[in-house]
Amino acid sequence: MYSIKMRSSNQDVHISGAETICEFDKIEQTVQRFYNKGFFHENGQPDFLNIKIQKIMEPIQQIKALQIIEDDKANLQHLTQECGVTEQALNQGMTYIKNETVYTGAIILSAISGKRLDSFGQRGIRATHFSFEDINNKGDLNERVTDALAIASCINAHPYVKGELCVSDDLTYTTGYFAAAKIGYHRLFDIKPVNTRYGGRIIFVDDCIDLNHYISFLESTPKQVVYETV
């Protein structure tokens, strides 16, 4: 199995990213797909694109995908409150999402105080070394949703994580999500105005979390997210 990652940017501003874990015979088509995504993205044409291929040398940890909850009227404040995220922490998370800084990874905040707990600056924390497998093979999820669900499932695979809020920085995509092990994966429609680049990924955690261990899991442990519908 091989890990394949793509990142593209223009003048050091993030444009697009993608990754997966695949068999050797799928490398060529995966690289072509990531190349197309990186170079022909609505956020602009990059002046830098990097594709990294690395053989996986350790066991792959299986993670059960979060359940997708279909609710057109999902309310972010109610969802976060149900998961133990305070209004103060949510407001601080939205401040990071709406500021002009384009973060390439997630920001980790205290679910109580909203204080930032990681120290990775604009880079943030990146959930990497993962793949997504739909064992039902229905093909009923598009690529954007499978990528989001895979990341959300990895991020929430820890008992001290309260939940994750994600808002895409793509210009015309206005649907975000809030996901948590307790309540599943909820899409949030029209969470931002169209034709805006603001966005981000916020992870709300208990203050007692072993941050170094958690970050190592997200960034270094090979993970396979398994999606199964009943």
UniProtKB/Swiss-Prot annotation:
The kind of enzyme this is, by top-level EC class, is: ligase
Alphabetically, the GO molecular function entries are:
6-carboxyhexanoate-CoA ligase activity; ATP binding; magnesium ion binding
Required co-factor? Mg(2+)
* Pfam family for this entry, one: BioW
* GO BP terms, alphabetized: biotin biosynthetic process
User: Partners and quaternary state?
Assistant: Homodimer.
* Biological role stated in the UniProt entry: Catalyzes the transformation of pimelate into pimeloyl-CoA with concomitant hydrolysis of ATP to AMP.
- Give the protein name, as stated in the record: 6-carboxyhexanoate--CoA ligase
Q: Which organism is it from?
A: Staphylococcus aureus (strain NCTC 8325 / PS 47)
Q: Which gene encodes it?
A: bioW
